Amino acid sequence: MMSYKSIMQTFLILFILAVSLQPSGSQSEMADDDLEIIEIIEPSWLLVTTISPSYSSDLVADFKALTGSQEFPDHLMAEDAEKAEGDFDVSLYFTVLDRLSMTGGRVLDYVYDYAGIGGAPVLYARKAVAPPYRNYSEYIAADSAVKPEVREDYYLRYIETDGTPEGFFQLALLLIQGEQFYQFWHAAYNDDAIVSDLEDARASLGGGLFGADEPTVEALLADLGKFDLAPVVSMSGDLVKVEVVIFTDWGGFVRRSIVMEKELPHLILEERSEVLVPYDCGIMF
């Protein structure tokens, strides 16, 4: 049996070991400080440009006009639907997005993804000399090792800007609203639309299928008046950040920030969203 003295000596040794294994207060604080530094580091944006609200508003309106009058073709309402002659031609986008161009001998095209409870186009870039994919299944099978959500922005690799702030704003517009045509049922939840000023915001709230009543519109606009809605494009070294305010019937007014590579291919590196003024139309379908 151990003596009282032996027990106390053993306890003392264990206590010393336990204390020695704990990180010191300064070490813990240093680790926390390091984590904070990592979280707040951002590029020093050397060139920050506010896009004219009149320019951006007119551009968005012209872009919407390309697809706004398109009627949904009955032949697309089926799984593995195939496009037909006379369906919308997405190459028309470049008549409005005049600071963008296709590269690498590619053209912009789309297949239609119909799934019973919803349907929407999926943009992709193909070689101009290659035949288009017949349907969505053929598109998926062409690169089955890659999940569709991973390659949803692949087409951007073949779209080049002219390097100006307006060019990168046009690229963001294509990314946000480029697949908003021939939307069926649940796909209509993808309704993000860029707004550039309070006039755009009012039109967004009062228009569409789910327009808000006048008191609600005025209250929301009063809250939104605290913010500058004009798009902003920031550049630094090999990075570009595009910030726009969008409106959605299922979320309200949201500032979206997109960081991408300045040089081709303009890979999307980060996307963030911040709700400025919340709103929900209350419609579910």
Q: Language-model features: where?
A:
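Extended, low-hydrophobicity segments enriched in charged/polar residues
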Residues: 33-225
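Short linear interaction motif-like sites in intrinsically disordered regions of transcription factors
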Residues: 2-3, 46, 186, 251
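Boundary at the C-terminal end of the N-terminal hydrophobic targeting segment
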Residues: 23-28
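Bacterial N-terminal signal peptides that target proteins for export
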Residues: 1-11
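Bacterial N-terminal signal peptides
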Residues: 10-20
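C-terminal, beta-strand-rich globular interaction domains
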Residues: 230-285
